[in-house]
Protein backbone atom coordinates (compact mmCIF):
# COMPACT_ATOMS: atom_id res chain seq x y z
CA UNK A 1 0.00 0.00 0.00
CA UNK A 2 2.93 2.39 0.52
CA UNK A 3 3.73 2.48 -3.21
CA UNK A 4 0.09 3.32 -3.95
CA UNK A 5 0.09 6.02 -1.26
CA UNK A 6 3.16 7.75 -2.67
CA UNK A 7 1.98 7.48 -6.30
CA UNK A 8 -1.59 8.68 -5.68
CA UNK A 9 -0.59 11.62 -3.47
CA UNK A 10 1.91 12.77 -6.10
CA UNK A 11 -0.53 12.29 -9.03
CA UNK A 12 -3.46 14.05 -7.33
CA UNK A 13 -1.67 16.81 -5.37
CA UNK A 14 1.82 17.33 -6.79
CA UNK A 15 3.30 16.63 -3.34
CA UNK A 16 5.99 14.06 -2.59
CA UNK A 17 5.53 12.68 0.91
CA UNK A 18 8.58 12.74 3.19
CA UNK A 19 6.89 11.59 6.42
CA UNK A 20 3.86 9.34 6.77
CA UNK A 21 2.40 6.76 9.11
CA UNK A 22 0.28 3.66 8.42
CA UNK A 23 -2.68 4.05 10.79
CA UNK A 24 -5.15 1.33 9.99
CA UNK A 25 -7.13 -0.90 7.70
CA UNK A 26 -10.75 0.00 7.03
CA UNK A 27 -13.21 -2.49 5.54
CA UNK A 28 -16.26 -0.91 3.88
CA UNK A 29 -19.26 -3.16 3.26
CA UNK A 30 -21.70 -1.15 1.14
CA UNK A 31 -24.81 -3.29 1.54
CA UNK A 32 -25.00 -3.42 -2.26
CA UNK A 33 -22.71 -6.43 -2.62
CA UNK A 34 -19.52 -4.36 -2.74
CA UNK A 35 -16.75 -4.64 -0.15
CA UNK A 36 -13.70 -2.38 -0.29
CA UNK A 37 -10.52 -2.34 1.79
CA UNK A 38 -8.77 0.95 2.53
CA UNK A 39 -5.28 1.37 3.95
CA UNK A 40 -5.41 4.49 6.10
CA UNK A 41 -2.35 6.73 6.38
CA UNK A 42 -1.60 10.16 7.80
CA UNK A 43 1.22 12.30 6.46
CA UNK A 44 2.86 15.30 8.09
CA UNK A 45 5.79 15.92 5.77
CA UNK A 46 5.84 16.71 2.07
CA UNK A 47 7.64 18.73 -0.59
CA UNK A 48 6.47 20.10 -3.92
CA UNK A 49 3.90 22.49 -5.29
CA UNK A 50 0.15 21.80 -5.52
CA UNK A 51 -1.25 20.97 -8.93
CA UNK A 52 -4.83 21.09 -10.25
CA UNK A 53 -6.71 17.85 -9.59
CA UNK A 54 -9.20 16.56 -12.18
CA UNK A 55 -10.91 14.41 -9.51
CA UNK A 56 -12.06 17.37 -7.40
CA UNK A 57 -10.91 20.64 -5.87
CA UNK A 58 -8.23 20.36 -3.17
CA UNK A 59 -8.80 22.50 -0.09
CA UNK A 60 -7.02 22.76 3.28
CA UNK A 61 -9.63 22.31 6.04
CA UNK A 62 -9.03 22.89 9.76
CA UNK A 63 -9.31 19.50 11.50
CA UNK A 64 -12.07 20.77 13.82
CA UNK A 65 -14.13 21.87 10.79
CA UNK A 66 -14.06 18.37 9.27
CA UNK A 67 -16.80 17.33 11.73
CA UNK A 68 -19.19 19.87 10.17
CA UNK A 69 -18.71 18.66 6.60
CA UNK A 70 -20.93 16.24 4.71
CA UNK A 71 -18.95 13.04 5.36
CA UNK A 72 -19.98 9.44 5.96
CA UNK A 73 -20.72 8.46 9.56
CA UNK A 74 -18.05 5.76 9.35
CA UNK A 75 -15.44 8.32 8.28
CA UNK A 76 -16.16 10.21 11.50
CA UNK A 77 -15.20 7.06 13.43
CA UNK A 78 -11.75 6.80 11.89
CA UNK A 79 -11.21 10.56 12.18
CA UNK A 80 -12.00 10.20 15.90
CA UNK A 81 -9.64 7.22 16.26
CA UNK A 82 -6.82 9.09 14.54
CA UNK A 83 -7.48 12.24 16.58
CA UNK A 84 -7.28 10.16 19.77
CA UNK A 85 -3.95 8.68 18.57
CA UNK A 86 -5.35 5.15 18.48
CA UNK A 87 -2.60 2.67 17.63
CA UNK A 88 -2.86 0.75 14.34
CA UNK A 89 -6.45 -0.44 14.05
CA UNK A 90 -8.81 -2.53 11.96
CA UNK A 91 -12.20 -0.89 11.48
CA UNK A 92 -15.13 -2.61 9.75
CA UNK A 93 -18.02 -0.42 8.62
CA UNK A 94 -21.24 -1.95 7.28
CA UNK A 95 -23.88 0.12 5.51
CA UNK A 96 -27.43 -0.82 4.51
CA UNK A 97 -27.11 -0.07 0.78
CA UNK A 98 -28.64 3.38 1.28
CA UNK A 99 -25.66 5.04 3.03
CA UNK A 100 -26.95 4.29 6.56
CA UNK A 101 -24.39 2.82 8.96
CA UNK A 102 -25.76 -0.42 10.43
CA UNK A 103 -22.72 -1.84 12.22
CA UNK A 104 -19.15 -1.01 13.09
CA UNK A 105 -16.39 -3.11 14.65
CA UNK A 106 -13.02 -1.98 15.97
CA UNK A 107 -10.33 -4.68 16.04
CA UNK A 108 -13.03 -7.34 15.72
CA UNK A 109 -15.19 -6.03 18.57
CA UNK A 110 -18.62 -4.48 17.90
CA UNK A 111 -18.90 -0.74 18.53
CA UNK A 112 -21.98 0.81 20.10
CA UNK A 113 -24.22 2.66 17.61
CA UNK A 114 -27.04 5.06 18.49
CA UNK A 115 -30.09 6.29 16.64
CA UNK A 116 -29.72 10.07 16.70
CA UNK A 117 -32.85 11.90 17.83
CA UNK A 118 -34.58 15.17 17.01
CA UNK A 119 -35.40 17.50 19.93
CA UNK A 120 -38.94 16.02 20.01
CA UNK A 121 -37.50 12.50 20.53
CA UNK A 122 -38.22 11.23 17.02
CA UNK A 123 -35.45 9.46 15.09
CA UNK A 124 -33.51 11.50 12.53
CA UNK A 125 -32.57 8.46 10.44
CA UNK A 126 -28.89 8.98 11.33
CA UNK A 127 -27.03 6.20 13.13
CA UNK A 128 -23.84 7.32 14.87
CA UNK A 129 -21.07 5.59 16.84
CA UNK A 130 -21.02 6.27 20.59
CA UNK A 131 -17.74 8.22 20.71
CA UNK A 132 -18.71 10.37 17.74
CA UNK A 133 -22.20 11.00 19.17
CA UNK A 134 -20.71 12.15 22.48
CA UNK A 135 -18.07 14.28 20.75
CA UNK A 136 -20.74 16.02 18.65
CA UNK A 137 -23.29 16.28 21.47
CA UNK A 138 -25.85 14.33 19.43
CA UNK A 139 -29.19 13.58 21.09
CA UNK A 140 -29.69 9.85 21.75
CA UNK A 141 -31.87 7.76 24.04
CA UNK A 142 -30.68 6.83 27.52
CA UNK A 143 -32.31 5.27 30.57
CA UNK A 144 -31.46 6.54 34.05
CA UNK A 145 -32.32 4.64 37.21
CA UNK A 146 -32.27 6.29 40.63
CA UNK A 147 -31.53 3.75 43.34
CA UNK A 148 -32.77 4.95 46.73
CA UNK A 149 -33.06 3.60 50.25
CA UNK A 150 -34.95 4.86 53.25
CA UNK A 151 -33.11 6.54 56.10
CA UNK A 152 -34.24 7.99 59.42
CA UNK A 153 -32.74 11.46 58.95
CA UNK A 154 -34.24 12.90 55.74
CA UNK A 155 -36.29 10.02 54.44
CA UNK A 156 -34.05 8.77 51.61
CA UNK A 157 -30.45 8.30 50.49
CA UNK A 158 -29.68 8.18 46.78
CA UNK A 159 -26.89 5.99 45.40
CA UNK A 160 -24.50 8.17 43.37
CA UNK A 161 -21.40 7.44 41.36
CA UNK A 162 -18.38 9.73 41.03
CA UNK A 163 -17.50 9.39 37.35
CA UNK A 164 -13.99 8.11 36.71
CA UNK A 165 -11.38 10.32 35.08
CA UNK A 166 -11.46 8.16 31.93
CA UNK A 167 -15.18 8.76 31.16
CA UNK A 168 -15.83 10.51 27.86
CA UNK A 169 -18.28 12.98 29.38
CA UNK A 170 -18.22 14.83 32.72
CA UNK A 171 -15.30 12.98 34.36
CA UNK A 172 -15.08 13.52 38.11
CA UNK A 173 -18.71 14.64 38.43
CA UNK A 174 -21.33 12.85 40.49
CA UNK A 175 -24.06 11.09 38.57
CA UNK A 176 -26.73 8.50 39.16
CA UNK A 177 -25.42 5.03 39.84
CA UNK A 178 -27.17 3.28 36.95
CA UNK A 179 -27.66 4.59 33.44
CA UNK A 180 -27.32 3.20 29.97
CA UNK A 181 -28.00 3.81 26.33
CA UNK A 182 -31.24 2.48 24.91
Task: Name each model-derived stretch.
Residues 97, 119-120, 154:
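Short, ordered coil/turn segments that flank beta-strands lining enzyme active or ligand-binding pockets
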Residues 23-30, 130-134:
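Short, solvent-exposed loop/turn elements at beta->coil junctions and helix N-caps
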Residues 84-111:
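Charged phosphate-binding loop/patch that engages nucleotide di/tri-phosphates or the phosphate backbone
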Residues 142, 147-178:
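A glycine-rich, hydrophobic loop/mini-helix early in the fold
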Residues 110-150:
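Acidic, metal-coordinating catalytic segment for phosphate/diphosphate chemistry
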Residues 2-19, 26-82, 104-111, 167, ...:
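Unchanged
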Residues 101, 123, 157-158:
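Hydrophobic "anchor" residues
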Amino acid sequence: PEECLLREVWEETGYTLTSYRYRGLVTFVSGNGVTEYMSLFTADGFVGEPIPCDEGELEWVDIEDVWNLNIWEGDKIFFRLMDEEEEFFSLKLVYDGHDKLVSAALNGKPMELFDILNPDGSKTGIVRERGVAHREGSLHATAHIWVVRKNHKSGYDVLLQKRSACKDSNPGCYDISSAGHV
